[in-house]
Amino acid sequence: MCIRDSHHPDQDYQNAGAEICADAAATSANANIILKVASPTLEEMDLIPNGSAFVSLFQTTREIEQVKALTNKNITGFSMHLIPRTTLAQSMDALSSQANIAGYKSVLIGAAHLPVYMPLLMTAAGTIPPAKVLILGAGVAGLQDIATAKRLGAQVEAFDVRPEVKEQVESLGAKFVEVDSDGDDGVGEGGYAKETSDDYKQRQQELIKQHIAKSDLVITTALIPGRPAPLLISTDMVNGMKPGSAIIDLAAENGGNCELTQGGEVIEHNGVKIDGTLNLPSSMQVHASQL
């Protein structure tokens, strides 16, 4: 099999000592350990030999049928999604490395959707103000969003339920949008966010609505491990956005942070583009594979 999209011909694999098989069934037939990037389909699960080991980026809390199939076939499964975000596990933290790529690419896609410049321009014909970009979620993807948008010259704001990321956001040149809170409502384990209280959510929605109405581009990255993506942008908020603005929803695979997001599709609502493109890292396959 030739992986042309990643610019690695069969010969590269053969030079590294691999044997090229005719199809997936032949590849899996006598394997003791199977490595796969994307989550397996149930049809692909049928090809995995009983008693083997399987390593992939599948989500055990969402892909229940795949987990059952592993159990029924006595297959030892390793989910790269469950690797903790710690210093010791950093070299194996595929989730963070791929999120970094998604953050970078989402800004470029967002800029392509906009009918305006990203940077401030001062020309003989007049002055063009910078685009206003709002990032919802300042994890690995969100921080890369900020860095990339700033390099393109945009005016960037970022929101996160974890107050401790304020310093990281500001160090990249963005303004941190913060909900007043007496506790650590959104602080979870391993540097991830957790479910917040109803009172916090209400104040959060009010704050986001104010800032989203002024934004040209909104990129959402908020995820909670093992749960559907939190709803941050309601239809009412989208209706309040400027025509020509855009939303890039990086949480589309987990249900989306925007109420109107349709996974794998780009739609337009009330003049606002909502991009639910899935698996952005695969569009930068060379570095996605390298990392």
Describe each region flagged by the PLM.
Residues 1-5:
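Conserved small/polar residues in nucleotide/adenosyl-binding loops
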Residues 17-32, 39-40, 186-218, 222-235, ...:
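A structured beta-alpha segment of the ubiquitous adenosine-cofactor-binding alpha/beta core
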Residues 28-29, 33-111:
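Phosphate/diphosphate ligand-binding glycine-rich loop within oxidoreductases
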Residues 43-47, 56, 223-233, 258-259:
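Glycine/threonine-rich flexible loop motifs
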Residues 61-87, 227-279:
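Rossmann-fold NAD(P)-binding glycine/threonine-rich loop
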Residues 81-82, 87-124, 252, 258-291:
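Adenosine-phosphate binding glycine-rich loop
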Residues 116-144:
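Glycine-rich NAD(P)-binding loop of Rossmann-like domains
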Residues 159-163:
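Conserved acidic E/D residue at the C-terminus of a beta-strand in Rossmann-like folds
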